[in-house]
Amino acid sequence: MVSVSRRSLLALGAALPLLGRLDWAVASPPPAKADKVRLNYNESPYGPSGAAREAMREAIATAGRYPYGHMYGLAALFAQQQGIAEEQVAVFSGSMAALRYAVLAFTGETRGLVMATPSYEVPRQAAESRKAPVREVDLNTEHAHDIPAMLAADPQAGMLYVCNPNNPTGTMTPTDAIRQALADKPKGSVLVVDEAYIDFSDAPSCVSWVKEHDDLLVLRTFSKIYGMAGARVGLAIGAPALLERLAVFGGDNVPAGTGLLGARASLEDVKLLPQRKALNAQRREETITWVKARGFTCTASQSNCFMIDVKQPAEQVIEKLAGQGVLIGRVWKNWPQWVRVTVGSKREMARFREVFAAQMSSV
């Protein structure tokens, strides 16, 4: 794992003015009541695995100590499983933090950000706080990243961001297209591939590519398929020199030991990913089939979320469903008639179908 150097800690002082300007997050809404069906944040309905919960409980006894050893151990295990060097893995308090630090490190007033739209908004927010130009490129007709258009959007770009599978659509960008982005991106820029949802899909990961490419950063999280959104553990994978540039902003901010040990236990549970992937796919496909049978269009998702064209202002549909206790995702401005739905449990998806049918019967 990349080490936190004295140099990076000193540089953090210079970075503080930038961090102070960051729009770290839009104000969070109050927690939903227990009886609400929460299909709005792409969370797992299952939470941490049994092994992860046990490891997290045991970690409480050591909470009086800084968990650096647990952090290094997690990085080492992930590196071993992926066939890469430990120095190519850095651990953060969620992959969102690593993504924000990447934008701060790789963009500036003369080196912009290129990303798709609709997509995850955090990099755009971070770039705007940096006063870096942002070029948002529409998804193509298959709802994948339009890589040729992204490559042409800004010849001086400092960072290209690809979320694969994409949030909010759940759709995939082909591996060959991502290779094209890596080969043809502006000189001196960094390609950041966000694989928060990759384990739900059938696509190969880009993690192994970091062995040959020092201008590629891959992000992973334990918030989605591992069900640990509240524990805040994420990974950045790349060349040590790239990770040092992130450490300037991340400093010595080690995640909590409970999350680190829960994450390690999750990686050690070899049955967890295939079980959850299959269960998610079953719930997703049966719901999409049901929605399409009623005349609505859905995105071809390989994630734990999908989008529906509701044929009317999406805000209205979100409000109607919320009134019946079913919370679904927000609206993306260039897709104003589409809603994002997180894939929940069997009970939650049954309730979603019941309420959706009742509220959309006249469409």
Q: What is the predicted role of each segment?
A:
Residues 147-155, 171-191, 195-225:
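Active-site pre-lysine segment of PLP-dependent enzymes
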Residues 105-162:
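PLP-dependent aminotransferase-like
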Residues 1-17:
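N-terminal secretory signal peptides and thylakoid transit peptides that target proteins
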Residues 49, 215-299:
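PLP-dependent aminotransferase class I/II
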Residues 73-112, 130:
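Phosphate-binding glycine-rich loop
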Residues 285, 292-361:
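Conserved C-terminal alpha-helix-loop-beta "cap" of PLP-dependent enzymes
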Residues 13-65, 80, 156:
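N-terminal "arm"/small-domain region of PLP-dependent enzymes with the aminotransferase-like
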